Amino acid sequence: QRLSRGLGDVYKRQHMGWNEVYFKKDNNKFYDLSGENFYFVHSYYFDAGDKDNILGLTNYDQPFPSALIKGNIIGTQFHPEKSQRAGVEFIKRFIEWKP
């Protein structure tokens, strides 16, 4: 249900490659990674429902939630393990994170 809006339907192609992620200012653990490029490979994006759960946004002709947070769980649309320096830094901060 929440994966009902596919990027393929809107853009007629998958979102593959590098794109910037802008993290919410109220989460200072990740905020200074805003504007860094992360690697994306997907055809869908997640409709967050509750906007308070959005940790980061990416623009691909329109903004979409690319990182979500709820309690002690973080989910990303991008692949931090494939995102070189920015991804390593994101993973490091995730490991050090204390919700």
Predicted features along the sequence, with ranges:
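Single conserved hydrophobic/aromatic residue that forms the stacking wall/gate
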Residues: 1-11
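Amide-donor transfer/coupling interface in amidating biosynthetic enzymes
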Residues: 9-99
